[in-house]
Amino acid sequence: MSGRNVESHMERNEKVVVNNSGHADVKKQQQQVEHTEFTHTEVKAPLIHPAPPIISTGAAGLAEEIVGQGFTASAARISGGTAEVHLQPSAAMTEEARRDQERYRQEQESIAKQQEREMEKKTEAYRKTAEAEAEKIRKELEKQHARDVEFRKDLIESTIDRQKREVDLEAKMAKRELDREGQLAKEALERSRLATNVEVNFDSAAGHTVSGGTTISSSDKMEIKRN
């Protein structure tokens, strides 16, 4: 008793290759292997040998249990040839890749423009703040200059006022000195003494009369010095 069984197996492998332009080329390798098996079976009369049951594990034991005693099996496998097939990406895939690249470029440009706009806003805000601060500083400097001028003016006026008061005070002191000198002069005149020699000859019918006297005038001498 004999028979033939034919089995076909298909193996497929896919390979992805990235070329220099950045596109992905998909290459599919298709391998078809045809296996042919031939089985020859010989039937023999079974021999009965009572034996204790044996439980075997593994592929050999399982095959022996399936076939049974008295049967032998032989098989031969023949491998066929292989063929390699290269597949190019379709037009749809190429268009999709082009759209992806264009979208990527647009997103990059959008990011760059957004960052540029943000920098412009920040620069403008910083410029306005700096100008406002500079204006405040300028006004404060003007106020400080006005305060300096007013302070110098006050110093000059204060100095002039002090000198004027000193002159007035000196004039008052000089007048008082003159007043005191005049008072001293008056007192000196009051303290002066007079001494006079007088001789009077008086002739009359009654006779001849002679009278005399001495007057001495003296005064105290005082020196007044002014610094």
Curated annotation (Swiss-Prot):
GO terms for biological process: response to desiccation. Residues 126-144 are annotated as: CAHS motif 1. The keyword Nucleotide-binding does not apply. One of its GO terms (cellular component) is cytoplasm. Residues 91-191 form a coiled coil. Residues 1-35, 86-126, 206-227 are annotated as: Disordered. Residues 1-15, 24-35, 95-126 have a biased composition (Basic and acidic residues). Induction: Expression is highly induced during desiccation. Its main location: cytoplasm. Transmembrane segments: none annotated. Disruption phenotype: Results in a significant decrease in survival after desiccation but does not affect survival under frozen conditions. It comes from the Eukaryota. Signal peptide: none annotated. Belongs to the Cytosolic-abundant heat soluble protein (CAHS) family. This is Cytosolic-abundant heat soluble protein 94205. The gene is CAHS 94205.
